[in-house]
């Protein structure tokens, strides 16, 4: 299974749940991590790429080839956790491989569609957890507010203490409370260039 830092971070960081949807599941990494963390949960993954779905199934994930826009279109409020490591190369050159292009560009699933359909599928007390480029934080928070989803936990991720944040991990719910909002940071590398203690602790269940 291909393992990427973003997926590992989200899979280790996301809230728990009993019914979970992984949007853009790819190889199934995040779904598998949540299956390990929440062994009693029903975890499903969807992806538009047929090869990715096949790989996720090989990795033990209950995966389906589907667009989020069409997923359970006749049923709402059915998940208590939705997670996604969404496509973010919005301004980069398109990948000549069409499958990978669709998987990594917001043309196939824009941020607003992701938020809108997640809001439709979440239970009243459900949560949406995303990992994004740090520069997308304001945009995604503004979009989420339009659909009555508000941040409950924000972790800004830095490769090194001396560098700007490179990723942000956010959890949203329908509860709008600035008082209860948790904001923290995670530095991935220590001063020697190795994995930081905080990163190791977050992911200790998954890394040898």
Where does each model-flagged region fall?
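Conserved SAM-binding motif I beta-strand of class I
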Residues: 42-47
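Conserved SAM-binding loop
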Residues: 56
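Conserved class I S-adenosyl-L-methionine
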Residues: 18-26
């Amino acid at each position: 299974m291909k393992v990427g830092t973003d997926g590992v971070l989200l899979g280790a960081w996301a809230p728990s749940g009993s019914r979970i949807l992984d949007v853009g599941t790819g190889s199934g990494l995040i779904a598998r991590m949540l299956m390990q963390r929440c062994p009693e949960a029903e975890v499903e993954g969807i992806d538009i790429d047929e090869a990715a779905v096949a790989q996720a199934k090989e990795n033990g994930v209950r995966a389906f080839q589907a667009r989020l826009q069409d997923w359970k279109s006749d049923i709402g409020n059915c998940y208590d956790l939705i997670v996604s490591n969404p496509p973010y190369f919005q301004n980069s050159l398109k990948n000549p491989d069409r499958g990978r292009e669709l998987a990594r560009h917001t043309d196939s699933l824009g941020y607003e569609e992701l938020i809108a359909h997640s809001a439709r599928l979440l239970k009243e007390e459900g949560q949406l957890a995303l990992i994004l480029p740090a520069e997308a934080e304001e945009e995604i928070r503004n979009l989420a507010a339009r659909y009555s989803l508000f941040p409950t936990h924000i972790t800004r991720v830095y490769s090194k203490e001396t560098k700007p944040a490179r990723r942000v991990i956010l959890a949203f719910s329908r509860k709008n409370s600035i008082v209860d909002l948790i904001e923290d940071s995670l530095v991935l590398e220590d001063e020697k260039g190795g994995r930081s203690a905080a990163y190791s602790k977050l992911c200790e269940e998954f890394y040898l």
